[in-house]
Amino acid sequence: MRCLTMPTLLRALAQAAHTGPPGGRTLHSSAVAATYKYVNMQESKTDMKSVTDRAARTLLWTELFRGLGMTLSYLFREPATINYPFEKGPLSPRFRGEHALRRYPSGEERCIACKLCEAVCPAQAITIEAEPRADGSRRTTRYDIDMTKCIYCGFCQEACPVDAIVEGPNFEFSTETHEELLYNKEKLLNNGDKWEAEIAANIQADYLYR
């Protein structure tokens, strides 16, 4: 019995499905069958050149060396990544990072305890307590932000009428404990003092679009 190759067997099955049993109806019309595309039915060529080429690709690993050549070519191209944390990419002036409370150049706190940021915060992450001063102005006695609740939407910064609470450019403030992410007024003011130059520059750069 002659052993049939897979492509030959597939062609025989397709022919049988097309012609059908003697005296019976065909399974497929010739017009439809003519449009069929059979996958992997092409037999490999057996001439000397084709056989030699296949043997060379198999024995000499040409595909492997072609892949290695592609990999080595990228060693001489400009890298698409940066060496973080020693190199850092640019940040938008609208970047929303770690929170900070700002002061006026005189050193006076900007916050007027209007509590708009506390009211607008969708995560209810801000807690403010305030009392009036002798001159009638209001200032905060407590300004807490639970950074584990914050979703960095920027609503607090948008709602503030005096640019007191802002989200600065710092994004490297990971901690080892939960308690370190519960910011109080002192922590927020220290952040503002530390990043004031960058914060002021970002606000100025975005001034026309606010």
UniProtKB/Swiss-Prot annotation:
Q: What are the EC numbers?
A: 7.1.1.2
Q: Where in the cell is it found?
A: Mitochondrion inner membrane
Q: Supply the SUPFAM superfamilies for this chain.
A: 4Fe-4S ferredoxins (SSF54862)
Q: Which GO terms describe its biological process?
A: mitochondrial electron transport, NADH to ubiquinone; mitochondrial respiratory chain complex I assembly
What is this entry's stated membrane topology? Answer: Peripheral membrane protein
Task: Describe how the cofactor binds.
Answer: Binds 2 [4Fe-4S] cluster.
The transit peptide region is found at: 1-34
Could you tell me one molecular function GO term of this UniProt entry?
Answer: 4 iron, 4 sulfur cluster binding
Subunit details for this protein?
Core subunit of respiratory chain NADH dehydrogenase (Complex I) which is composed of 45 different subunits. This is a component of the iron-sulfur (IP) fragment of the enzyme. Interacts with RAB5IF.
Give the similarity note.
Answer: Belongs to the complex I 23 kDa subunit family.
What is the name listed in the Swiss-Prot or TrEMBL entry for this protein? NADH dehydrogenase [ubiquinone] iron-sulfur protein 8, mitochondrial
Question: Lineage of the source organism?
Answer: Eukaryota, Metazoa, Chordata, Craniata, Vertebrata
State which gene encodes it.
NDUFS8
